Amino acid sequence: MRPARALIDLQALRHNYQLAREHRGGKALAVIKADAYGHGAVRVAQALEAQADGFAVACIEEALELRAAGIRAPVLLLEGFFEADELALIVEHNFWTVVHSTWQLEAIEQAQLAKPLTVWLKIDTGMHRVGLYPHEYQAAYQRLLVTGKVARIVLMSHFARADELNSGCSDEQFAVFESFRKGLAAEISLKNSPAVLGWPHIPSDWSRPGIMLYGATPFGQAHPLADRLQPVMTLESKIISVRELPAGEAVGYGATFVCDRPLRIGVVAMGYADGYPRHAPTGTPVQIDGQPSRLLGRVSMDMLCVDLTGVPQAGLGSRVELWGKHVLASEVATRAETIPYEIFCNLRRVPRIYSQD
């Protein structure tokens, strides 16, 4: 069997959720969209269901997968519904739905529903993706109330730059939110992972932790709370070939790395088809049999090369950690000029092995 695999530490997941819930985030919906950022949505939901206040996914297909697996906790559709006929399924399965557009509001007004909805009414305070315009917000709230088809409304927005701790954008967005929700009697939800960790003075009845659940920092700098996160995924494989190369020899496609001295090279069963970032450069950290080392040359579809020169005991079958508890996913992502969200979500054919502790 090919040795590439992702080890998922469910106890670390629970620890990270509890950190989100405790740190001024109010109740917390665990965000498990995109297959729980590559960690496996059903297994993550099963691990958290007894602890979590609910879950959030992107769309009804992801929510239905959870219900089919027996998950009965509240599930919020972060992008709401895409077609009006989804409302019947939302009611049938007790999903909560975001409303971010006037057409969705009109669909609710026109729908014949078996029971009332829980709606999270989204205002665009500066992200400028989806959300009602601020001047529409109060009227939309009142329209939902008078339909008689909505049992509960939560007021929500989303911060564009909460991961930038020196930016005033989050405070500016909060000021817009406060101005246009004035007089509306409802709970609020504003905080994603960076807002939970980095903006404690901004209130929120509900938080929506995502990347922090999986143990990756949303910040590009050290942060005391983010430093308490525990990595959930360890991506690992093994050495399948060893080469002794003299100075002047090149490694991999494009000969982008040339040995400046005699080097001992290990070939690892891991490549960009598995989800390891192709653009990770020479020098990206790895760990081999517990010792730090580095990536060499270009990442191939199924293989990559590492430096064994400083790890003389390593050889065929040696364990290689690509990211996890000793090699931070955030550092690998930074070297590859991307973000942890992307490298987690890109994992495709690597089997996941779950542990409870």
Curated annotation (Swiss-Prot):
CDD domains: PLPDE_III_AR_proteobact (cd06827). GO terms for biological process: D-alanine biosynthetic process. One of its GO terms (cellular component) is cytosol. The active site is at residues 33, 253. InterPro entries: Ala_racemase, Ala_racemase/Decarboxylase_C, Ala_racemase_C, Ala_racemase_N, Ala_racemase_pyridoxalP-BS, PLP-binding_barrel. Its EC number is 5.1.1.1. PROSITE patterns: ALANINE_RACEMASE. It holds the Pfam family Ala_racemase_C. Keywords: Isomerase, Pyridoxal phosphate. The modification N6-(pyridoxal phosphate)lysine is found at residue 33. Its cofactor is pyridoxal 5'-phosphate. Substrate binds at residues 129, 301. Pathway: Amino-acid biosynthesis; D-alanine biosynthesis; D-alanine from L-alanine: step 1/1. One of its GO terms (molecular function) is alanine racemase activity. Gene3D superfamilies: Alanine racemase, Lyase, Ornithine Decarboxylase, Chain A, domain 1. It catalyses: L-alanine = D-alanine. Coiled coil: none annotated. Belongs to the alanine racemase family. Catalyzes the interconversion of L-alanine and D-alanine. May also act on other amino acids. This is Alanine racemase. It comes from Pseudomonas savastanoi pv. phaseolicola (strain 1448A / Race 6).
